[in-house]
Amino acid sequence: MVYDLIVIGGGSGGMAAARRAARHNAKVALVEKSRLGGTCVNVGCVPKKIMFNAASVHDILENSRHYGFDTKFSFNLPLLVERRDKYIQRLNNIYRQNLSKDKVDLYEGTASFLSENRILIKGTKDNNNKDNGPLNEEILEGRNILIAVGNKPVFPPVKGIENTISSDEFFNIKESKKIGIVGSGYIAVELINVIKRLGIDSYIFARGNRILRKFDESVINVLENDMKKNNINIVTFADVVEIKKVSDKNLSIHLSDGRIYEHFDHVIYCVGRSPDTENLKLEKLNVETNNNYIVVDENQRTSVNNIYAVGDCCMVKKSKEIEDLNLLKLYNEERYLNKKENVTEDIFYNVQLTPVAINAGRLLADRLFLKKTRKTNYKLIPTVIFSHPPIGTIGLSEEAAIQIYGKENVKIYESKFTNLFFSVYDIEPELKEKTYLKLVCVGKDELIKGLHIIGLNADEIVQGFAVALKMNATKKDFDETIPIHPTAAEEFLTLQPWMK
């Protein structure tokens, strides 16, 4: 039998493509070497959000006295881990049931290419023919093959790196007194904020002068201040040269400038992730790659005509003239930011977010089997950092907007205030958690090119504003909209130039 589509990888993008294609009456096979759901379900979005929720519950309980509650509480981490993992197992089973319901053939094992139409699966069990028992190898043939293998943690060549764990293994921790995280991206920041609120002494090590360097500086300043107030230790200019194991659950972190930090139960490395493509044998087919990422065009097609890729394992190459300089932020190519003219050379970009992979997978299936033409739109994708307090952001930072459009063409509206929720807290005003928000406007019409917020419920607030920015909302549009009171979000609709 020849499949219409073979999907390698059962994460968000692969599942979305497989199920959508099957609903278009395509004959589909999906290959997965581990648990269904990929990074998001198993070691990413879902368990992370549950831990974020636990940390948020901690904050409410700890401060409930300000609302008149006399609350004494204790925390049972092993119990939370057990309930979290049971929920994830339930999701794994739901994913399996959904594939069966949509008549997608599931194969368990590691896939590699034999040719552009054939793959070899090792260590498999065909779940649709269980009477056959376990199979050592299986060869599948498909007219189209989609690679959706996701990514995996990166471990740099640091002495003693074998003594560390990745963000994936963080979810296995059931007890710890002191944890150090090496890295300053969104995964590191989200985890360190959770760790502290679970009663664990916390250190985060950043190579540069601040965390989350690609985000708006004003927003990150607010976050860093809150983290320091909550006794999270931020170590900057931290060039780690060794992780030394002194004894069991006693690790020390050594920096190049001689600084030493000691007595860590766990050290977690969060310095990036790379595509999980090493077992695919792409070199047999001369599939184009860039820094190990599979290169695809805007239709998700690789350099081999019938092979596609979606999600965290690929990068989109845009080689035609780029007229919308606002897109440049997405390309992670800072050298382009100071260019005012159109850019014509090849640019590669990748947005590693679950909804992006799902969207790309579904639209690919629509193009392949319904002959539709819609492509994933990478412009103005909203992003949330589940820190404490959370951050919501859309579009350009103030710094990027000035570099692209010039300072004279950029107008900033911002406000910083205490959310009403914290108004009754019986503490000094400067200790109350602040909400900070900003609009980045460009041109005489004040087109909103960036929207940023940090504060309580920012993660829920930002979604609706993403629609407005996609529809080219201006500051005038915001001004003419009647706000909901009392809310934090209403501040976006009432901002004035003098507000600071």
From Swiss-Prot:
Its cofactor is FAD. InterPro entries: FAD/NAD-bd_sf, FAD/NAD-binding_dom, FAD/NAD-linked_Rdtase_dimer_sf, GSHR/TRXR-like, Pyr_nuc-diS_OxRdtase, Pyr_nucl-diS_OxRdtase_dimer, Pyr_OxRdtase_I_AS. FAD binds at S12, G13, E32, T39, C40, K48, A111, D312, T354, H485. The active site is at H485 (proton acceptor). It is an enzyme of class 1 (oxidoreductase). Its EC number is 1.8.1.7. The keyword NADP applies. Its main location: cytoplasm. Binds 1 FAD per subunit. PROSITE patterns: PYRIDINE_REDOX_1. Glutathione binds at S12, R19, Y95, R362. It catalyses: 2 glutathione + NADP(+) = glutathione disulfide + NADPH + H(+). Optimum pH is 6.8. It holds the Pfam family Pyr_redox_dim. GO terms for biological process: cell redox homeostasis; cellular response to oxidative stress; glutathione metabolic process. GO terms for molecular function: flavin adenine dinucleotide binding; glutathione-disulfide reductase (NADPH) activity. Inactive at 80 degrees Celsius. NADP(+) binds at I187, E190, R207, R213, G272, V384. One of its GO terms (cellular component) is cytosol. Disulfide bonds join C40-C45. There are 2 isoforms resulting from alternative translation initiation. The displayed sequence is likely to represent the shorter isoform. Catalyzes the reduction of glutathione disulfide (GSSG) to reduced glutathione (GSH). Constitutes the major mechanism to maintain a high GSH:GSSG ratio in the cytosol. Belongs to the class-I pyridine nucleotide-disulfide oxidoreductase family. Homodimer. This is Glutathione reductase.
